[in-house]
Amino acid sequence: MGKTLKSRLVAYQANGSKLGLLPEPTSYTVSFTHDAVGALTVSYSRKALRGEILDRRLETGLEIAVEVSDGGRWIEPYNGRFVIASRSRNALDVSDTVSLTGVSYGWLLKKALNLDTSRLETKGDEKGTRKFANANAGTIMRTFMDENWNRGGVKVDCSRFTSGADSAGKQWGYMLPSIYYDLGISIQDVLDSLVNNGLCDWRTD
């Protein structure tokens, strides 16, 4: 007899502690996307069990994880954590149901930017851009993420890979002879370009 995969919603503070289960959603849809940003939509009555969790102001941060189980323990799968980006409700709805829209955690890299002006090219056709020479995908991403972290930017932990090896411990392959990035480009756009050129894959966990 085959197993049935079940799912549930768990709320968290932004990059923080667990707020609790959300056991009575009206409905929800989710996409777990490899090498891209997935999405979550949830309808939930704030009069339902633990609905008060959704009274939080979005400015204080709210994340929802989608956990799954096939009858054993509950786990949060890869790409299963979502940052709630918007909330809406019908003021005339007596059930006080809110509609939440979330994007997977990798979306936060949109907020991390190439801002180091001290490393820009100062002459030639590429003046004003950031150059990487003889660099692999790990070196490029590690450099940008470390700079973002050290200046107090978006707190996304990418410590499992280095400039020498990916998160599985395998050495990076192709070395880019040279590549240039505009000032202000998001690290998400940098990552997308590396993925699209077959230089790396990514997921969140």
Predicted segments, located by residue:
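Short conserved beta-strand and strand-loop elements enriched in small hydrophobics
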Residues: 60-73
